[in-house]
Amino acid sequence: MKILVVNCGSSSLKYQLIDMTSEEALAKGLVERIGIEGSILTQKVNGEKYIIEEPMKDHKKAIELVLKALVDKEHGVISDMSEIAAVGHRVVHGGEKYASSVLINDEVMKALEDCVKLAPLHNPPNIIGINACRELMPKTPMVAVFDTAFHQTLPDYAYMYPLPYELYEQNGIRKYGFHGTSHRYVSSVASEMMGKDLKDLKVITCHLGNGASLCAVKEGKSVETSMGFTPLAGLAMGTRCGDIDPAILLFMERELKMSPDEVDTVINKKSGVLGISGVSSDFRDIEGAAEEGNKRAKLALDVYHYTVRQTIGAYTAVLNGVDAIVFTAGLGENSAASREEILNGLEYLGIKIDAEKNKQRGKQIEISTEDSKVKVFVIPTDEELMIARDTKEITVK
């Protein structure tokens, strides 16, 4: 059984074709600059690149080219589109309606449209991608897998904001959380590595990329997470501010005479480690600048590490203890220095790190010592595989 996994952004599209017998990706691809001059599709099969450069005015044209690349006689991996048993779509926001993945039909599409107001940047391209696939592959079942779904198990006192209750009732203003598919995947892998049932464990998962969030997992369920109503909340990130005093936004509008759009740009695109360092949103650049003595770069890293450490401490309290901490995503998987700095100061939990093991980059590995009271893992995330597994489970019933 082969499943196509699609992740549509506003001007890009990532995809994988996964053979579910072996759970191996037969092909991985990226389409860039959709609707912009210089559109390009890059597909990788066994390390070999296949590139298509031609105008792609919309996502439908992009998906046409994806299917063309997959069945290409020389560079493709299937002989016919009928070999694709189902398509799994990453959808950022499922609102309160969806606590798990769902088979897509017209009713689901209407619900996704209703969620656009909750994710105006992310859900529209997700919807466009689904519509394009449904048009091009009308007989192939489609499944929506939501970033928010895993966090629908948050207790009401964790997701409710201390605002007038009618804002929640009438407008859906509450904590939703994101990166759910990643948190779900790495917590389950951690339990496998420990040889224990996830339902018997207390796990804190740290998805640390340009966007970053933490999740507290108890009895296999998300009980707390750092992102909120939007992916802006929580930790300091690459370009996002994370948690700040909300009155700062009023100050920016009233005193600095900034428009709502200008404030939005500042807090989403000009803040985080980029804003503090003035160097970059890429942690490799910031680490390099800090090593060369750039004080603002060092401060940016210190602030970032502090917010992660602070949140791990809070989630240990939420869980009443912790059995395992997992690092994943770009920074979590590849920066030994960041992992070390984040864990520095958590010795009271009984965490002991093996310095040699911690030097590993991008590998699935336990980096804690044998006598560490808390197990610490680096687990490369695989959201595409999780989407494919959900798609198989729903379509094979």
Swiss-Prot record:
Chain positions recorded as Mg(2+) binding sites: N7, E383
UniProt GO cellular component terms: cytoplasm
Main location: cytoplasm
Active-site annotation: D147 (proton donor/acceptor)
GO molecular function: acetate kinase activity; ATP binding; magnesium ion binding
GO biological process: acetate metabolic process; acetyl-CoA biosynthetic process
Compartment(s) where it occurs, according to its Swiss-Prot or TrEMBL record: Cytoplasm
Annotated metabolic or biological route of this protein: Metabolic intermediate biosynthesis; acetyl-CoA biosynthesis; acetyl-CoA from acetate: step 1/2
Catalytic activity: acetate + ATP = acetyl phosphate + ADP
PROSITE patterns: ACETATE_KINASE_1, ACETATE_KINASE_2
Cofactor note: Mg(2+). Can also accept Mn(2+).
Keyword annotations of the record: ATP-binding, Cytoplasm, Kinase, Magnesium, Metal-binding, Nucleotide-binding, Transferase
Binding locations of ATP: K14, H207, L208, G209, N210, G211, D282, F283, R284, G330, L331, G332, E333, N334
Database matches in Gene3D superfamilies: 3.30.420.40
SUPFAM superfamilies documented for this protein: Actin-like ATPase domain (SSF53067)
EC number: 2.7.2.1
KW Manganese (keyword) present: no
Binding site for substrate: R90
Keyword Transferase carried by entry: yes
Function according to Swiss-Prot or TrEMBL: Catalyzes the formation of acetyl phosphate from acetate and ATP. Can also catalyze the reverse reaction.
Subunit structure: Homodimer.
Family to which the UniProt record says this protein belongs: Belongs to the acetokinase family.
Protein name: Acetate kinase
Lineage of the organism: Bacteria, Bacillati, Bacillota, Clostridia, Eubacteriales
